[in-house]
Amino acid sequence: MKVTAAFAGLLVTAFAAPAPEPDLVSRSAGINYVQNYNGNLGDFTYDESAGTFSMYWEDGVSSDFVVGLGWTTGSSNAITYSAEYSASGSASYLAVYGWVNYPQAEYYIVEDYGDYNPCSSATSLGTVYSDGSTYQVCTDTRTNEPSITGTSTFTQYFSVRESTRTSGTVTVANHFNFWAHHGFGNSDFNYQVVAVEAWSGAGSASVTISS
């Protein structure tokens, strides 16, 4: 990704995708996946059976974290969530986040964000209208970066909501179908979560996933 000098150092970690961690939890029904990449950088708590999680982080976060709840195998099914999210002064996202195994890809449907819009420095693919708002769509190629298979080269896809929100239903299929015109596999899904990611500043989030 082409980035400005001001963000270059930050984005080394922010867009270095987390590999699976030993403390990821899987269960058999409903929400069955806990994303806990560097959750120790803040106060991460969750109730998997209730579909709720919270994350609080203080100024001085030294690395990237991605935390959330979801499913071991993603899909194009719609996701309904509600959240209280505060990230003013923080490089952070509230997003539907996941991976595709092949062709390997990392994806974000960004519902709200702090001080950094990832499409401000990535390759634009245009816009898609979904769930009451236009989303900016962009892509980037990550070369020899951490991934779900270790270190690899993969594509990132972003849809960034222009009318940001902290609750609603995400029609995931609208984004997958749009990205599919630009190389997104739209099948062979790895995990998928509603996530909070941050790599600077301070903030908080409390999220409930209802579907």
UniProtKB/Swiss-Prot annotation:
Residues 28-210 form the GH11 domain. It is found in: Secreted. Its main location: secreted. Keywords: Carbohydrate metabolism, Glycosidase, Hydrolase, Polysaccharide degradation, Secreted, Signal, Xylan degradation. One of its GO terms (cellular component) is extracellular region. It catalyses: Endohydrolysis of (1->4)-beta-D-xylosidic linkages in xylans. Residues 1-27 form the signal peptide. The keyword Ion transport does not apply. InterPro entries: ConA-like_dom_sf (IPR013320), GH11/12 (IPR013319), GH11_AS_1 (IPR018208), GH11_AS_2 (IPR033119), GH11_dom (IPR033123), Glyco_hydro_11 (IPR001137). Its EC number is 3.2.1.8. Pathway: Glycan degradation; xylan degradation. The keyword Secreted applies. GO terms for molecular function: endo-1,4-beta-xylanase activity. GO terms for biological process: xylan catabolic process. Belongs to the glycosyl hydrolase 11 (cellulase G) family. Endo-1,4-beta-xylanase involved in the hydrolysis of xylan, a major structural heterogeneous polysaccharide found in plant biomass representing the second most abundant polysaccharide in the biosphere, after cellulose. This is Endo-1,4-beta-xylanase A. It comes from Aspergillus tubingensis. The lineage of its organism: Eukaryota, Fungi, Dikarya, Ascomycota, Pezizomycotina. The gene is xynA.
